[in-house]
Amino acid sequence: MARGPRYKVPFRRRREGLTNYRKRRKLLLSKKPRLVVRKTNKHIIAQVVVAKPQGDVTIVGIDTRALAKFGWKGDENNTPAAYLLGLIVGYKARIRGVKEAVLDIGLHRPVAGSRVFAVLKGALDAGLEIPHGEEIIPSDDRISGKHIAEYAEKLKKENPELYKTRFSRYLQRGLAPEELPTHFEEVKKKIIEYYEGKLAKAIAQ
């Protein structure tokens, strides 16, 4: 263990790999709400958070399990699900009066085209203003799950048994993975129609 008068013990959350305090300070100095995106092994979580003197206050918070409400049959931790989550959290934030935010991905590596940036794209499409570079946004094909559908179609022809095993959860839910892009567009349309109606009512009040 390092010792000596110049050695500084890191904050506990930094030691445990939970918080990057330098990045957090920069986000807080913006004085804007934060779109906080986190991943688990099974789900993706998105929150819009405002910093207050007494601590962070969550304006809206949701995870990909909420997609079932709109009939989502795909996995809850892939790129299409991440986008749909961002779409929902963006609309919910706007309904609560939030117009802009800054992205907070915590300790996740900022890899262009990754799921955290799919959440960002969904929130942008819902109308939230969030500073970003276009190069980090996943392609439309990845967002719709076309890459998954193409892989599934190829696997189905080459190895039907492995196809059934690898996509067993899709098939159990009644979704052929080759149809994922079409299913994605159907669920996206439902989300937009639902929240555009709620947003119109919120603005009219």
Swiss-Prot record:
Organism in which the protein naturally occurs: Pyrobaculum islandicum (strain DSM 4184 / JCM 9189 / GEO3)
Family, per entry: Belongs to the universal ribosomal protein uL18 family.
Key words, A-Z: Ribonucleoprotein, Ribosomal protein, RNA-binding, rRNA-binding
Function comment: This is one of the proteins that bind and probably mediate the attachment of the 5S RNA into the large ribosomal subunit, where it forms part of the central protuberance.
InterPro entries per the UniProt record, alphabetical: Rbsml_uL18_euk (IPR005485)
One GO cellular component term noted in the UniProt record for this chain: cytosolic large ribosomal subunit
Protein name: Large ribosomal subunit protein uL18
GO biological process: ribosomal large subunit assembly; translation
Domain of life: Archaea
One Pfam family per UniProt: Ribosomal_L5e
Gene3D superfamilies assigned to the protein according to its UniProt record, in alphabetical order: 3.30.420.100
Subunit-level organization: Part of the 50S ribosomal subunit. Contacts the 5S and 23S rRNAs.
Gene Ontology molecular function terms on file: 5S rRNA binding; structural constituent of ribosome
SUPFAM superfamilies hit by this protein: Translational machinery components (SSF53137)
Gene: rpl18
